[in-house]
A protein has these predicted regions:
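An N-terminal assembly and electron-transfer interface module characteristic of large anaerobic redox
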Residues: 1-465
Length: 465
C-alpha cells in the first residue's frame, strides 16, 4: 500500500497545501480554503451540507447518462435535438457504445430560434431521419432540450404530428434539459420513468413481476431475485430484454418492483397507467431495514417472508474477515457507488473500520436516520463534495494508501485500490453487504488503473473504448 499524499493548490496558485493533514505554508489560509469543502458530519446541515453554485465536473465518467439509459429499450432509436455544442457529448457517448446506427441528431441553429420554426424543425427533422433509416424502428425516443422550453415550443403538438405520420412507431418524450435539475423530477428520475412510457396495456398476469428503473441487471443471487424465483414468479427486467416484444411483455406484470431511489417516481407512474402494483424496496446496508423491506414486499406479493436465519451472522463474519485484512487503512466512500453511502459508512464505522471520508453533494430523505446517527456517534467523519469548484484543486496528485469505495472517492484520494462499481451494481439486500465486503477485500489486495478506468463512460454497458 502506498503513502497518502493529496497535493492541492489554491485557485490563485500562490499557496501549496498538503492534503495529508500537515500544513505546508499558511495554516490559516489552508483552513479557510478547506472550510466549505471539508465538513465534519457533526457540523454539517441536512440535506444540503454544501452551498449550491458554480459546479466542477471531474473526469470520472462511470455513471450512466441519458444516452446509455435510453439504449436499454431494445431496437429503439434515439434522436437528440439541440445546439451543436450540446450534441458533442451525446454523440461521443453513442460512438463509445458502438451504437451509432441507433442514434441520430438534429442541430438547432440560431435562425431556428429567430424564425420561430422550432416545432417544424423537430417534426421535419425526425421525419427525415426515420425515412432514411435502413430499418424501421418500433420505437423512437425524441430528446428535446432546454432551448425548446425557453422558446415555449408546443411539444404536445409535435408528438401528435409525429404519431400521425408514423402510426407504426411508438414515440416517447425524453429530455436533455439541465434547467430541470433543481425543481420537480430530476433528469435522472425523468429518464428512468421514460423507459416505461412505451409499454402498452395488456392482460395482467398474477405470477409475473418486473424489476424496473435500473441501468444494471439485478444480481441473480440477491435476496430480491431469490424471493421471486423461489415463489414461482416470472421475472422481467429491461436489462435482459433483447427484442421490443420482450420489452412489451413487462406491461403484463402484476407487480413492479424498484429499489433505486431515482426509479421510484417512474414506478408510481407506471402503476397508475397500467394498473399493476408498484413496490419500492429501499436500498440499505442496515440489517433491520433490509429485513423490514423484504417482509413488506412478501406481504404485497402474498408469499411467505424469506428465511433470514444466518444472514446477519454471515455479514458479521464477513465484516470481521475484511477488517482483519485491511485493518485501519483509511476508507473513502462516494455516492456513485450506491444510493446510500451514509448507510455503508455507518455499517463500516460500527464494525471498527477507519472510514474517514464520504464524498457526496447532497443527501436524500432516506439518509436522515443514518445522518443523525453518524452526527451523534462519529462526528469526525468528513463530508466532501464532488462538484464544488474548489474540488478541482483537491484531487490527489500522487498515489495514496486509501481504500476507496466508488470511482469518485478513488479519483479524489488518488488511489488505485478501489471498488469499481456504480449505481449499486445490481446489489440489493444482504447480498449487497456481502458483495461489497468481498469487493473491498479484492480492492485492498489488487491494484487497478484508476485514471484509465474512471474515464470510461457508463460502467457496465457496452463500450468499444
Amino acid at each position: 500500500m502506498l503513502r497518502h499524499v493529496m497535493d492541492s493548490y489554491d485557485p490563485a496558485g500562490k499557496k501549496h497545501y498538503a492534503g495529508n493533514g500537515q500544513a505546508a505554508g499558511d495554516e490559516d489560509g489552508r483552513e479557510e480554503f478547506l472550510k466549505d469543502v471539508c465538513i465534519p458530519i457533526g457540523e454539517a446541515s441536512f440535506p444540503a451540507p454544501f452551498a449550491s453554485g458554480l459546479e466542477y465536473s471531474s473526469p470520472v465518467r462511470g455513471t450512466w447518462n441519458i444516452v446509455h439509459t435510453g439504449m436499454l429499450i431494445p431496437e429503439a432509436h434515439e434522436i437528440f435535438i439541440c445546439g451543436a455544442g450540446c450534441l458533442r457529448g451525446v454523440v461521443l457517448t453513442a460512438a463509445e457504445m458502438g451504437t451509432q446506427e441507433r442514434f441520430s441528431t438534429v442541430a438547432v441553429r440560431e435562425h431556428n430560434l429567430l424564425d420561430g420554426d422550432m416545432e417544424e424543425l423537430v417534426i421535419d427533422g425526425v421525419t427525415d431521419i426515420i425515412n432514411k433509416l435502413k430499418k424501421r424502428p418500433p420505437a423512437v425516443l425524441v430528446y428535446t432540450s432546454c432551448m425548446h422550453h425557453f422558446a415555449g415550443c408546443d411539444l404536445d403538438m409535435i408528438y401528435a404530428r409525429l404519431r400521425e405520420r408514423f402510426p407504426d412507431i411508438d414515440f416517447t418524450d425524453c429530455y436533455m434539459n439541465p434547467i430541470m435539475r433543481k425543481s420537480g423530477l430530476t433528469p435522472d428520475q425523468l429518464m428512468r420513468s421514460r423507459l416505461y412510457t412505451l409499454l402498452k396495456e395488456r392482460d395482467i398476469r398474477p405470477d409475473e413481476a418486473a424489476i424496473i428503473g435500473n441501468d444494471l441487471p439485478t444480481d441473480e443471487d440477491s435476496d430480491l431475485m431469490l424471493l421471486l424465483k423461489e415463489n414461482g414468479f416470472k421475472i422481467h427486467e429491461i436489462t435482459s430484454c433483447r427484442t421490443y416484444e420482450e420489452y412489451q411483455e413487462m406491461a403484463g406484470s402484476r407487480f413492479y418492483i424498484s429499489y433505486y431511489p431515482s426509479a421510484k417516481a417512474g414506478g408510481d407512474m407506471l402503476s397508475q397507467r397500467l394498473g399493476g402494483t408498484h413496490f419500492y424496496l429501499p436500498f440499505s446496508f442496515s440489517y433491520d431495514e433490509i429485513e423490514d423491506g423484504l417482509r413488506r414486499l412478501s406481504d404485497v406479493l402474498g408469499v411467505p417472508a424469506p428465511d433470514f436465519s444466518g444472514k446477519r451472522q454471515a455479514c458479521e463474519e464477513a465484516l470481521e474477515e475484511t477488517l482483519s485484512l485491511i485493518g485501519q487503512t483509511p476508507v473513502a466512500i462516494d455516492y456513485t457507488f450506491c444510493p446510500r453511502p451514509l448507510s455503508l459508512a455507518r455499517l463500516l464505522l460500527d464494525a471498527g473500520f477507519n472510514v474517514e471520508r464520504v464524498y457526496t453533494d447532497g443527501l436524500t430523505g432516506e439518509e436522515k436516520e443514518d445522518f443523525d446517527y453518524l452526527q451523534a456517534h462519529f462526528p469526525q467523519l468528513l463530508l466532501m463534495p464532488t462538484v464544488h469548484p474548489k474540488m478541482r484543486f483537491l484531487a490527489a496528485k500522487e498515489p495514496s494508501d486509501y481504500l476507496a469505495v466508488g470511482q469518485k472517492a478513488a479519483y479524489f484520494t488518488g488511489t488505485d485500490h478501489f471498488v469499481n462499481i456504480v449505481e449499486g451494481g445490481g446489489m440489493i439486500g444482504y447480498e449487497a453487504v456481502l458483495r461489497t465486503l468481498s469487493l473491498m477485500r479484492e480492492a485492498y489486495l489488487e491494484k487497478k488503473d484508476m485514471r484509465t478506468l474512471v474515464q470510461i463512460k457508463g460502467w457496465g454497458c457496452e463500450s468499444c473504448v
